[in-house]
Amino acid sequence: MPYLLEMKNITKTFGSVKAIDNVSLRLNAGEIVSLCGENGSGKSTLMKVLCGIYPHGSYEGEIIFAGEEIQASHIRDTERKGIAIIHQELALVKELTVLENIFLGNEITHNGIMDYDLMTLRYQKLLAQVSLSISPDTRVGDLGLGQQQLVEIAKALNKQVRLLILDEPTASLTEQETSVLLDIIRDLQQHGIACIYISHKLNEVKAISDTICVIRDGQHIGTRDAAGMSEDDIITMMVERELTAIYPNEPHTTGDEILRIEHLTAWHPVNRHIKRVNDVSFSLKRGEILGIAGLVGAGRTETIQCLFGVWPGQWEGKIYIDGKQVDIRNCQQAITQGIAMVPEDRKRDGIVPVMAVGKNITLAALNKFTGGISQLDDAAEQKCILESIQQLKVKTSSPDLAIGRLSGGNQQKAILARCLLLNPRILILDEPTRGIDIGAKYEIYKLINQLVQQGIAVIVISSELPEVLGLSDRVLVMHEGKLKANLINHNLTQEQVMEAALRSEHHVEKQSV
């Protein structure tokens, strides 16, 4: 039986650099292939070649789809063949309705007039295929990210897709939304639709894939049956080394209490009747890693936003640092108290994309380079930038490169470098490894361990329970704004954490002292 897709000996160069070096990939109709590799390995370049974003003639090699050679000059050419790609940054127009987005560029017309009756009938069939029940007049911007992802798939199905490429489709989805998406992909597979799945979440890769293809440094390392591979096998192929412990568990001792929060309550910024955080109290010791776990909407991010002075609504409660009550109502006051934070959404809140990597690093600590005068000491700033880039292993061709051009992992390391310039005593990490590859994750985990060995207290908020359990000395479990458990991490399991989160009563387990 002929393959649906064959990419033969693809090579793509940028100047003297080979981004893709003689890579081949093939898959059958209805097959799900996961494409794995660190950021910068060449995955995205290979997919851009396949989709016509890099046109025929700009690369070497051959692409055969459904028995015919593709020589695409534009992404529309491959879409007509039945190839569709859905990027991590969704390509929906938020101000248009769901129906308008699905048919954008593929409108059904009759005598030059759009036939809304036919489009509505087609719309209902498409949404049934992705298990959505939404009015066609609903504005896309009013949907959650999980629903928007399914609208993108429905849009692809409207183009008679035969090969669906999903690039980090669950990076911003909840576990429930992820489960729905994976079920839909499996259902599409039963209808003969093939899928190339790109994700850093190896548990998803294992769960969804028939075959796993690994690319490293632009080269094809190997393609194997998913059933015969463990997550450790995938990691070793990706990074060319064994990460014997993904979560470095280097010994560190905790000191005395540095932070205490008492009876913290925060209200919705618009609706004062809704409590986003409800009477939460906890403490933190020097050199301790405190994890905060809970489902989406649990109040984790809202809690630490109050601590850092950036919660947009009203809140009340008491914050003590070194036993002294402090008033923190903005981020500058938090920084003055020795608190730094890596935000949940790095693109929205963590970086200035068009600004240089170096300037992003020093952005919050410019007073270090003024020496009491208004003029910056450029030499001192540049020295600090280079030291930070080296210390955090930020991969960039130049400190002057716009940070928006870096991979997610390197953007995150630059944000961490900025935080460390503030000499924090308390470091808050909200989703510290979201959307970054396993190698960058490992480096960040090692850094966290180094920081607590220096006596810095760290708070980690993560939607990935294995990450919380792998890093934390102690775990707070939140649900619907309430603190449900305060657990010492003596071989805690995911089941124990979820059980604590979903208890109907408000019960805080007593912690060891």
From Swiss-Prot:
Annotated Gene3D superfamilies: P-loop containing nucleotide triphosphate hydrolases
Binding site for ATP: 37-44
PROSITE patterns recorded: ABC_TRANSPORTER_1 (PS00211), ABC_TRANSPORTER_2 (PS50893), XYLG (PS51280)
ABC transporter domain segment(s): 5-242, 259-505
Keywords: ATP-binding, Cell inner membrane, Cell membrane, Membrane, Nucleotide-binding, Repeat, Sugar transport, Translocase, Transport
Zinc found in the keyword field: no
E.C. no: 7.5.2.10
Membrane topology according to the record: Peripheral membrane protein
Gene Ontology CC annotations of this record: plasma membrane
GO molecular function, a single term: ATP binding
Localization, UniProt: Cell inner membrane
Pfam families linked: ABC_tran (PF00005)
CDD domains: ABC_Carb_Monos_I, ABC_Carb_Monos_II
Domain of life: Bacteria
UniProt entry tagged with the keyword Cell division: no
Subunit structure: The complex is composed of two ATP-binding proteins (XylG), two transmembrane proteins (XylH) and a solute-binding protein (XylF).
NCBIfam families: PRK13549.1, xylG
Function summary: Part of the ABC transporter complex XylFGH involved in xylose import. Responsible for energy coupling to the transport system.
Stated name of the protein: Xylose import ATP-binding protein XylG
Protein's organism: Shigella flexneri
